[in-house]
């Protein structure tokens, strides 16, 4: 096996401050997480095509690895669709970010607690979440820093409880500096 674009494609949730490292030796893949793990927490590692088979370099899609630092795996789920209101098309390159904080400025100051990406139809899904309330934000993260910056597309923050299918599409819209200063 081999890997490509690990820092771009690999997602660990809850998110880590330091990028994880994938090490390949023959047919063995080792994942090293550099941050301290939280107690009693389920972690999801989504490979998103960053691992390729050795024969034809085909990406291994839709592969996730789960583990828990507690006695059980969390089972909460959350799913929905994201649409770019500027084009009226599904957002196929959006982050969907969950925060445990209720602060309005959390999306400009902190990385999300949980992260997933939309597929080509704008669909997203979180699995193995703790059962609780979250603040959900969709973000077209141009500079890939997992925080809202000027001229990126963002949704309004939505308070959501896990184990939900969001019935309405979440729309994202342009974010400009003038609205940024009112949030800080």
Model regions: which residues?
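Acidic, low-complexity Ser/Thr/Gly/Pro-rich repeat segments typical of extracellular/periplasmic
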Residues: 1-121, 125-128, 133-137, 151, ...
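Structured interaction patches on ligand/partner-binding surfaces of diverse proteins
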Residues: 61, 140-179
């Amino acid at each position: 096996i081999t890997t490509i674009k690990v820092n771009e494609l690999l997602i660990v949730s809850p998110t880590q401050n330091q990028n994880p490292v994938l090490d390949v030796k023959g047919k063995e893949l080792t994942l090293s997480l550099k941050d301290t793990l939280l107690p009693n927490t389920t972690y999801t590692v989504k490979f998103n095509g960053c691992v390729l088979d050795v024969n034809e370099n085909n990406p291994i899609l839709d592969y996730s690895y789960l583990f828990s630092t507690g006695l059980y795996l969390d089972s909460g789920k959350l799913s929905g669709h994201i649409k770019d209101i500027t084009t009226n098309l599904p957002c196929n390159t959006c982050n969907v970010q969950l925060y445990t904080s209720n602060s309005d400025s959390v999306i400009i100051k902190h990385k999300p607690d949980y992260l997933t990406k939309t597929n080509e139809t704008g669909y997203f899904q979180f699995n193995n979440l703790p059962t609780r309330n979250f603040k959900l934000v969709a973000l077209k993260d141009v500079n890939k820093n997992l925080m809202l910056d000027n001229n990126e597309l963002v949704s309004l923050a939505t308070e959501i409880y896990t184990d939900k299918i969001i019935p309405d599409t979440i729309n994202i819209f342009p974010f400009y500096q003038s609205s940024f200063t009112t949030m800080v």
